[in-house]
Amino acid sequence: MAEQIIRVSQIGYLPEAKKFAILMTGDSGRWEYTRYDFSDLKEEGWHQLKIGEAVSDSFLISKHVYDGLADFPLNYMRQQRCGWNPFTGDSCHQKDGYIIYHPTKTGQHIDVRGGWHDASDCLQYATTTGNAIYQMMLAYEQYPELFGDMYQTNGTPGANGIPDIVDEIRWGLDWLDRMNPAPGEFYNQLADDRDHIGMRFPKDDQADYGWGVNNGRPVYFVTGEPQVQGKGMNISTGTSSIVGKYASCFALGSKILAPYYPELAERIGEKAKDAYDLGVRKPGFSQTASVRSPY
């Protein structure tokens, strides 16, 4: 007998909204999809759908189904935190990192703990971090009333008088601040694809970049020129693509953090113009660097 699965909205539905479910029927390695319209169901409360022998997960119909939803993605951001994870209650990557590609500081240690692990590996990029920060800042700037306060700055449960999205913005900006330790000194990337050695928790990282297992990762200095550690060069042509993200995040971040974290707000506000000026002096794009498999 073919397997049947019903997919419904995990969030739920407004009473007067259109409502659809997808019936997935699988047989011999092939899936067929059928869409069902149940918009006539408007009764508030928890429901399930039954189609043939298949039964859906429970879903909610309510006028308040979207209440608090703006805070939900922050669970993912907290889960991705590097340095200390509030979900697991443990630390990781406490010895990051060691500078590479800097004309005078290569091999020196720099404290760049924090930020978020990127995707499903442990790599960290200033460009994706900047994108994540700016999207959160833009959402908060336009709709501050939608965000609650249920977590501490470190991501553990408990209100602290600061909107949770501001705490998460601060977590990201603190890392970008560390990745820009001095005027004209910007870093683009922490770790590289030597990380891709199998699934494990960040605290159990077995990657060795030359300083011993889980004993610090490389931090790539922004040169605006091609870089590589392995098979092929990237094609970086300048700095503006990355330092522009620093500039925009620092400028808007300074404004958003000022009521809550004035010291960090002032520091990054002063750094914003330096980032902008470097982009003007050396226009072009900065790509990330890979070692094992150029991408």
What are these regions (language model features)?
Residues A21, I51, C122, I133-G155, ...:
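Well-ordered alpha-helical scaffold segments within catalytic/enzyme domains
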Residues M24-W31, M77-Q79, M150, D204:
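Generic alpha-helical propensity signal that fires on short helical segments
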Residues E3-Y66:
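Ligand-binding face of N-terminal immunoglobulin V-set domains in extracellular IgSF glycoproteins
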Residues S56-S91:
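Low-complexity, Pro/Ser/Thr- and charge-rich linker/hinge segments at domain boundaries
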Residues F20-L23, K50-I51, D71-Y76, F201-K203:
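Surface-exposed beta-strand edges and their flanking turn/coil or helix-capping segments
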Residues R78-T128, G155-C249, Y260, E266-D277, ...:
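Extended ligand-binding groove/face enriched in aromatic
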